[in-house]
Structures are given as structure tokens and as C-alpha cells.
Amino acid sequence: MENDNLFQSELRLFQTALGDIAGKRVLSVGCGSGLFESMIDCSGIEGIEPSHDMGAIAQKRGVNVIAFGAIEDTELEENAYDMIYLNGSSSYMEDLTRAFGVCKKALKPNGKFVSLDVPKESAFGFMYLLAKEAGTFDHPSLNGVMPQLPYPLELCCAGVWHSTEEKIDALKALGFHDFDFYQTLLRNPMYTNEVVEDVVPGYQSGGYVAIIAHK
């Protein structure tokens, strides 16, 4: 993998945020191709994915894809999951309150909710927003500051991009509590693939941030 150090930094955050999932019922919302899940024991992870093509890859990697579609339109068993997480998928949700509300209903009492994503206010977030507005990464303002392998332009353009505070407010309004925050990719984007970064507490500096809350 050409951007392996960046991926390993994100994987460390993913593993830190999820913690020990052995014996737990876990749901990945917007599981994509299951790339992150393929790096851990994902035998107990269920998934929801809008794309049939991506979901098929995730299934081959061991994720039990239970539904194809958006979380907002999915009927889930209530009080059923020990943990529900969104790894990168909240940036494609227009209505966070609606999406997070579906997750809350499906969580067991005191169940764990995790959202990992690029914050709108981060350096990566600003870069993606500019690329979205310009319709290209070849904008003069981005010359000399881009990472070697940026996020695919079509995904930047499809993203809604929310701030961390916006997500926190939506979760608090739904009654989630006992928050924890972790972050990585503290370097500027063009340097993030030079080394694997450690996970540190907080959310105000990282280019990839994990929000952990409980029902």
C-alpha cells in the first residue's frame, strides 16, 4: 500500500476506539469494502453498506453485511448491539440526528457508539472542501501542499463534511453521555505518510478523530 504509514495511523485510531470487541455484537454503519475490518478479527462484525459492490468486497473480507442501504432507511433490531461504529461514513450523512438516532435505538443500554472521521475544521477537511468547490485537486492554492495520494476526488465531492462539535451536539441532543475523544494525523497533510503517528487524546488537532459515547 503506497500510503501505508497514513493508513497505519488511521488503523491505530480505529483499534483504540473500538477496543476489545471479542464476544460482542458489533455493527459497522457504512462498512465500505471492509478494509479496516480485514486488519482485525471481524468475525463478529455486522455491516450496513449503501454500495452493493463495496459490500460484496466487505463480505469477502469477513464482514457479515446484513443490509444494503442508508442507515436512516434501515430497520434494525432495538437494544441489540453492544457497539455501533461509523468509520468515515458520517461525512456522507446529511442529517446526523436522524442517523445517530437510528443507531441509538439499536444499541443496548449503555451501549458504545463510535464515530471516526475527518473533521470539517481540520487541515484535511479544509483541503477536501476546497477540492470539492474547485472540482479538482489541481487548484493553484493546493500546489505544493497536497499529500502524495489524496482522497479520491469523487468522494470529496460527495461528502457533506461535519465538524466535530456538530457531531458532539447531535449526540448530546439524543441523550448520549460519557464521551471520550482520540485523534491522529496531527501532521499537515503533505507529511502524514512519512511516519506512523501515535493516537493521542482529544479532538482539536487531528486530521482523523474518534468520538466515543454511550447510550
Please tell me what each predicted stretch does:
Residues L27-S28, G32-D73:
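Class I SAM-dependent methyltransferase SAM/SAH-binding core
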Residues M1-A22, L35-M39, M54-I57, V114-G144, L185, ...:
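Conserved class I S-adenosyl-L-methionine
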Residues M83-L96:
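A short SAM/SAH-binding and catalytic strip from SAM-dependent methyltransferases
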Residues E72-I84:
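A short acidic, Gly/Pro-enriched loop at the edge of an enzyme's catalytic core
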